[in-house]
């Protein structure tokens, strides 16, 4: 339950390392208008607080920063999914793991077979999920559909783990699971669906590309922990972010800086022999690093934590041109990225 504090919560983040600038899709406003209309059509803007929470998620900006060159018509499904899944996250984080697992299995099956009729008819998420699944099957290659199903399976399994765990995890355990329940895998799969050409299987599943995908997802997850830290302080929630494992903010930043530095090092090794489809995927992964961070600082999802208190949280961030640390961090679940 949200508890209001007496004054705004202000968090000053240490500078974070980014060697590239933010890139912005030129048709964000169009995608936002379409996405909000889609959410309203399915009843997710029926009261002022709910409408504010939907709008404040800024899903069009999120994907517009991550995929700045995508066809806006193909990217619209990702934008709509973002609005819906941010709303889903708001309610699923408060439920029990058994209920989450049940709905997760039904969502995954619906993505596989839109006419499966396994989602409850009275669930507000059923109709929009079926709509998204139908659109994907109609417009995307079979390889894209399978990757979307697999990535949702991984994400929802991680979300169920987050809901079920009752003890403070080690850093190693936390990083292994965080990249799953942060939703990075389905987000990056939507990158692929926004392109007509499929990244060949032998490329997308190669160890080096898998490492790049995991690195981008882990940086996004850690940065989410950073820019949502003030929200958790304001709501007086237990520490479910990386700082809950015992790391202070400078140590969290040092860890993500190591990963960002390694990402660019490995990306530059992979790009010269990448197919055009893989090169575009790696471009979007690169944009995701800076785009996710800037979106997190901007979105009212974290500055207005419950939709009723605009400006309740202020998170101040800045960017550095040099990493605060480099090299493998000595964490078994991720050290393989440096090998």
Swiss-Prot record:
It catalyses: (2E,6E,10E)-geranylgeranyl diphosphate = phomopsene + diphosphate; (2E,6E,10E)-geranylgeranyl diphosphate = allokutznerene + diphosphate. Binds 3 Mg(2+) ions per subunit. Mg(2+) can be substituted with Mn(2+), with a loss of approximately half of the activity. Mg(2+) 3 binds at residues 224, 228, 232. The keyword Iron does not apply. It comes from the Bacteria. Its EC number is 4.2.3.222, 4.2.3.224. Mg(2+) 1 binds at residues 89, 94. Mg(2+) 2 binds at residue 94. GO terms for molecular function: metal ion binding; terpene synthase activity. The keyword Lyase applies. Keywords: Lyase, Magnesium, Metal-binding. Pathway: Secondary metabolite biosynthesis; terpenoid biosynthesis. Its cofactor is Mg(2+). Belongs to the terpene synthase family. Diterpene synthase that catalyzes the conversion of geranylgeranyl diphosphate (GGPP) to phomopsene, a diterpene previously reported from the fungus P.amygdali. Phomopsene is the main product, but the enzyme can also produce allokutznerene (about 50% of phomopsene production activity) and traces of spiroviolene. Cannot use geranyl diphosphate (GPP), farnesyl diphosphate (FPP) and geranylfarnesyl diphosphate (GFPP). This is Phomopsene synthase. It comes from Allokutzneria albata (Kibdelosporangium albatum). The lineage of its organism: Bacteria, Bacillati, Actinomycetota, Actinomycetes, Pseudonocardiales.
């Amino acid at each position: 339950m949200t508890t209001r504090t007496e004054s705004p919560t202000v968090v000053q983040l240490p500078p974070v390392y980014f060697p590239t600038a933010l890139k912005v899709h030129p048709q964000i406003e169009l995608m936002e208008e379409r996405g909000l209309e889609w959410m309203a059509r399915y009843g997710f803007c029926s009261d002022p607080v709910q409408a504010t929470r939907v709008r404040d998620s800024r899903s069009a900006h999120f994907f517009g920063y991550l995929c700045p060159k995508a066809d806006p018509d193909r990217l619209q499904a990702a934008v709509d999914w973002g609005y819906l899944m941010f709303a889903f996250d708001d309610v699923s984080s408060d439920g029990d793991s058994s209920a989450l697992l049940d709905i997760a299995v039904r969502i995954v099956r619906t993505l596989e077979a839109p006419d499966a009729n396994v989602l409850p008819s009275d669930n507000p998420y059923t109709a929009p999920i079926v709509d998204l699944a139908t659109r994907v099957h109609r417009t995307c290659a079979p390889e894209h559909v399978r990757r979307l199903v697999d990535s949702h399976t991984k994400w929802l399994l991680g979300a169920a783990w987050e809901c079920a765990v009752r003890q403070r995890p080690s850093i190693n355990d936390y990083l292994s699971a965080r990249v799953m329940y942060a939703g990075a895998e389905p987000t990056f799969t939507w990158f692929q669906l926004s392109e007509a050409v499929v990244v060949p299987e032998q490329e997308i599943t190669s160890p080096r590309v898998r490492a790049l995908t995991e690195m981008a997802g882990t940086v996004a997850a850690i940065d989410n922990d950073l820019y949502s830290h003030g929200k958790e302080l304001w709501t007086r929630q237990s520490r479910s972010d990386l700082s809950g494992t015992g790391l202070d903010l400078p140590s969290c930043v040092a860890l993500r800086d190591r990963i960002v530095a390694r990402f660019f090092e490995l990306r530059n090794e992979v790009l010269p022999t990448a197919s055009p489809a893989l090169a575009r995927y790696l471009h979007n992964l690169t944009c995701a690093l800076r785009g996710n961070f800037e979106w997190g600082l901007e979105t009212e999802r974290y500055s207005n934590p419950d939709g009723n208190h605009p400006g309740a949280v202020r998170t101040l961030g800045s960017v550095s041109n040099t990493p605060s640390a480099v090299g493998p961090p000595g964490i078994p679940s991720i050290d393989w990225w440096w090998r």
